[in-house]
């Protein structure tokens, strides 16, 4: 059944976390590797040439002077069907993954005083104390939007993207605020304190499908674990 549906789609293999890829491949293709050699090669090529080299590729672009920006969304938990459901996310992808390394409190929590006091510089710390962008791969060009879901793109985020593309901006330069709030209006707001949540965006219908697919992948992971046992 898996091979006739999700496991037969390369796009879904591209979303398998790096740490789970080999186990998932062994579960699905054990004993039929030769029959699916072409498909496996396609997925392996993407993993080795794109997924595993993402940071290397971005660093190379940066060293060549090519400007780019990373915009992450947050203030939601991951889907409540797996062990990492408390991760701060956009409702689908953790902020850590989106931003290439931000340090985050769990959803509904803030970073501890001990952690904050350990920072040499707090300029990359979010005003709501949920995110520390100093650990990002590119802290100077990483921006965060609070209260916006994974696959929704209202006018404010599009306007921000256009503004970033038209400016040689950095966080230290002050052209744009690193942490902003989406409250459903036409403009992003500056986050000024701990309790400023605004009005969270209404959950889109597509989240029903996201929950289904997340549950499906969690089911596959459990199959892998049971096979190991």
What residues fall within each predicted segment?
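Lipid deacylating catalytic domains
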Residues: 1-229
């Amino acid at each position: 059944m898996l091979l006739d549906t999700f496991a037969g789609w390369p796009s879904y293999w591209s979303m398998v976390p790096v740490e789970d890829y080999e186990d998932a491949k062994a579960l699905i293709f054990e004993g039929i590797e030769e029959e699916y050699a072409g498909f496996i090669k396609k997925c392996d090529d993407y993993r080795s040439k794109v997924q595993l080299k993402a940071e290397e590729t971005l660093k190379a672009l940066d060293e060549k002077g090519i400007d780019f920006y990373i915009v992450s969304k947050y203030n939601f938990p991951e889907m409540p069907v797996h062990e990492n459901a408390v991760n701060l996310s956009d409702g689908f992808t953790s902020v850590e993954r989106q931003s290439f390394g931000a340090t985050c409190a769990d959803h509904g929590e803030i970073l501890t005083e001990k952690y904050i006091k350990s920072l040499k510089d707090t300029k990359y710390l979010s005003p709501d104390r949920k995110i520390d962008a100093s650990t990002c791969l590119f802290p100077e060009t990483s921006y965060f939007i609070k209260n916006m879901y994974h696959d929704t793109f209202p006018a404010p985020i599009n306007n921000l993207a256009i503004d970033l593309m038209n400016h040689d901006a950095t966080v230290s330069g002050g052209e744009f605020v690193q942490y902003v709030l989406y409250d459903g209006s036409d403009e992003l707001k500056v986050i000024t304190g701990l309790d400023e949540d605004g009005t969270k965006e209404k959950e889109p219908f597509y989240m029903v499908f996201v929950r289904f697919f997340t549950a499906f992948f969690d089911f596959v992971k459990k199959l892998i674990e049971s096979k190991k046992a």
